[in-house]
Regions:
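A solvent-exposed interaction/effector surface
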Residues: 1-211
Length: 211
């Protein structure tokens, strides 16, 4: 049976609808950086998605080709994730200013993926998909101490969940700890093309520190 990160790291991918404090281990991602409204047809965000999935599935399906990746095990491609921020803010997101978004869109990779394996997968995907993969990067993220919560509903309703997270953290002696390396983080467990807005499930995660 294929290794499923959502099941093996349930605390990180399937939190409850109540805020909780977690310590997130370092993880590797295939990532693309960009700017702008994620809902814009043909925008940077939507153009990033086939690149991410192209690399992730090339690595997963390497078992059927001549490439032998040391330590390989079959895995379920993890869900799409995103790190978001806006310039000249304290790390909080203003959902009314979608055109001002900066993002790192990404998909988690197994730790067996080396730089050499990653570069091979990018080259393979570029040939198969006939797309420009030059924006793709191998990213290592160490989030550490965070507060997180499962948000159910439209993306624009996330501020209510974030308010609950902020209150929960403050009551326990934590403060936000946003920086260039520690950002607003979302994990998308639902496909908005196939799921009603009120049923969308999104993990929201914010970096924190003890006061």
């Amino acid at each position: 049976m294929a290794y499923d990160f959502k099941k093996e790291f349930r605390e990180l991918y399937r939190p409850s609808g109540k805020p909780s404090v977690v310590t997130v281990p370092p993880m590797s991602y295939v990532a693309v950086r960009g700017k702008g409204n994620p809902n814009t047809e043909g925008g940077e965000y939507q153009n990033a998605l086939p690149l991410l999935y192209g690399v992730a599935y090339t690595i997963k399906m390497s078992k059927k080709g001549p490439r032998e990746i040391e330590g390989y095990f079959d895995f379920v491609v993890p869900p799409l994730e995103g790190f978001w921020w806006q310039d000249r803010t304290d790390g909080e997101i203003d959902y009314a200013r979608k055109d001002d978004f900066n993002f790192i869109s990404c998909i988690r990779l197994p730790d067996f993926v080396t730089r050499e394996d990653f570069d091979w997968a990018v080259s393979e995907a570029a040939v198969k998909k006939k797309l420009d993969f030059s924006a793709v990067e191998l990213l290592r993220v160490d989030e550490g101490l965070c507060v997180q919560c499962m948000h159910t509903g439209p993306y624009d309703d996330e501020p209510a969940t974030i308010d609950a997270m902020r209150t929960f953290a403050a009551e326990r002696g934590y403060a936000p700890d946003f920086s260039e390396a520690r950002l607003h983080h979302e994990i998308y467990l639902s496909d908005p093309r196939k799921c009603a807005p009120e049923k969308l499930k999104t993990v929201i995660r914010h970096p924190i520190k003890l006061i």
